[in-house]
Structure formats: structure tokens, C-alpha cells
Amino acid sequence: MTDFTTMTACGECCIGCAKKESGMCPGCIEAEGKVPEWAESGVCRIYACCAEHNTRYCFLCENFPCGELPKMMPWKTDVEEHFSELREEYRNQRISSESDVTSRLERVLAHWDLEAPGIGEQFNKDSGRLIYKVTAKSGWYLLKGLPSGTPEAVIQGNVQAHLFLGNEHGLAPALYPTKSGDRYVNDMGYRFYLMEFIAGRQMEETPEDEYKLGQATRKMHLLQGYNVKSPLTQSKARYYTWFRNHAFVKEFDGILDAIPYFEELDQCFVHTDIGPHNAMVRTNGEAVFIDLDDSGIGSRYLDLGWPFIMQFVDFNHETEEMRYRFDLAEAFLRGYYGEEGISREEYDLVFQGAVQMHISYMQSYGPYAVDSLWKILRFGMEQKEALWEMIREKEKTDEGGSK
């Protein structure tokens, strides 16, 4: 029986994969072909395509089989037949496992001191993780299981981030220890940990929520006493090897040259993916961050810059028309900097952080998305001065109103 918990998007397990030659994967986007221990790096062509189509495995995609598949895996001539067999086996396993998964998860919950625990709604069913709402006499909880193939460092980093940001400071879901004092348990091929269930609502892309998100981000960046580094790479060096065969490479390298060395600038506790999609509002109105997978000590400017192109550029995938959400960007900055405002030097660094963060994702959605992502990058950069003028005009208006 196939162990799907160790399988990556291409239908193989990276560790010990027979397709690798001298440790290199033929399906890698990067020229050297080196694949890290965990394949979810965005450099694998198949994984990048799956990420673009929001599916865990290629054979679960609604477009399977597609004409691009043989091009992405030319070394596997029977790929469609093989993937069809995997899809059938996967579905059969899901049907058989779902019949007893509740009782198995309830046995997992026995590790925690809960009275009358029960398994409720499952979230993100096709994510590769097991995420369930848990009911108990003491309230609601969230049980999260990461595949055992996930590196231990990722699990430990996630746990430490929740303990710091959640348990100590209330800016994320708190983590609950087991009866024996452990932070997570190994069972069913997963590492499980139990978290606080946030009663409230998901943040939305509104000026009001962006303002609240900016305030919460400021609080997070000011926290002291954490020393676990974020796994997010701060260096821009690797990007100089990207897109060598694209017509825009000269302009791309010029953009890279202008980006500062963020590892030499402000370091603090960072989330790495700040946006309404990763934040909630408690019933009392307080903002909390969720999905702390890459959280830790990192660049404040990369963290702060993330949404200014990645989120605030609204891209229509059908028409390729773009618009900039100035209202959201202004509200987020106002929430973060408050009445003191933002200096021009600080603003430049934030926007350079936005540029680098967008570049870091330009290989994550496959080679066919690169040109669109390049257009988004240039469009986002072109809005920089217009947003600055908007901020300055609002500051003048506020100053006039306070006299």
C-alpha cells in the first residue's frame, strides 16, 4: 500500500527517489537541480504547478491529465497511467480511512487532559495536513497534524512560535501541552499538537481590518525575548541565478542590485506572510495571527513589505488587468506607524522589502506564471510614488484638521 504521507506532488518520495541522479532531481526548476529535504520549496516544477492549481498532488488536480504534464516529467513516459493508478488508490484509501479516522483521532486526543473530547469539522481537507476542530466540556480546540516527513526543525519552530506569540503574548493561538508535558505527539504518521480555537472571524480585505492588522504587526515586531531564527532566506544572492534566459533579465538584475542586504538591517520576530488570510479577529476585537510555519527572528522590512505587491496589487487572471489597493496599503501603514507617520527612508526600505518578497515567489507557481508575475512586480513598483504622495497628502490634511 502506498504511503501518501511521504509522497510529494510529483508522485514520488524525495528521500531515496530513484529518479535523482547524483542527488539531483530532473524536475527541478533551478539549474543545479538540487532539491531540499522537504520538496515544498517552490523549486519543483510539479509542486509549483500544483500550488498554482491549489492541489496537493498532480493526480488530484481538476485539470488532470493535462498537456503540460508530459513536458514537466519527460523522464516518465507512463506518467498519466501511473498517476491514474495513484489517484484511484488514494481515493480508496481516503474512503477506508475516513470510516475509522474519528476513533483514531479520539485516541490521539487522549494524550491531552480533556473531558469528553470529540472530533468536529475538518479544515483544509486537501492540504496534506490533518486539521480538526475539537469539542470538549472546557470549550473548543484545534488539533493540527503535520506529516511525519516534515523536518523536526519545522515542527519545533512552529511550536516555539506558538508558545511565544500565543501563550506569552496573546497574538496567536495558544498551544496546550499533553498530560506528560510534551508539546506534540507522534501518531498515525503525523505529529499532532493541540491549539486554542479562535472564536471570532477571519480578517477581510477592508481598510478597517488592514488598520487593525497594521497595529497587530507593530505589536509583534516590538516583542523581545525570542531567539529562534525564521527559516525564510533573507539574502538576495540566489535570485541572481534566476531567469537567465528571460528577456527581462538585465532589468531584473538591476532591481536586485538596488535591494539592500536585509540580513544587516532590523531583525525582530516576524510572521513572513502577513495578510487577512493569515489573521483573525477575536470576538473582543483583538487581532491574532495564524499559520506560523515560517515565523521566527527575521527581517522587519521583508515582513512589513510582504503585502505591498503580493496582496495590494489586484491582478485579474483572465484579463491581466491590474489595479492597486491604495486604500488597503494606506490603512495598513497608518495602523503600523500611528500618529508618528513613516519617514521617506523607512518607506523606501519597506517597499524594497515588498520587491524582494514578491521576487521570492516568482518561481513558486511554475514557469508559465513567470511573465505574469514579472508584470505584477513592475506594476507594483510603479505605484510606489503615488502611494507616498497619498500618504503625505493625508498627513497634511490631518495636521490641518488638528490646528
Model-predicted segments: where are they?
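Active-site acidic catalytic loop and adjacent metal/ATP-binding pocket
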Residues: 127-137, 142, 175, 257-302, ...
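Active-site activation/catalytic loop segments of kinase-like enzymes and analogous catalytic loops
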Residues: 303-340, 355-371
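Conserved kinase catalytic-core helix
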Residues: 200-232
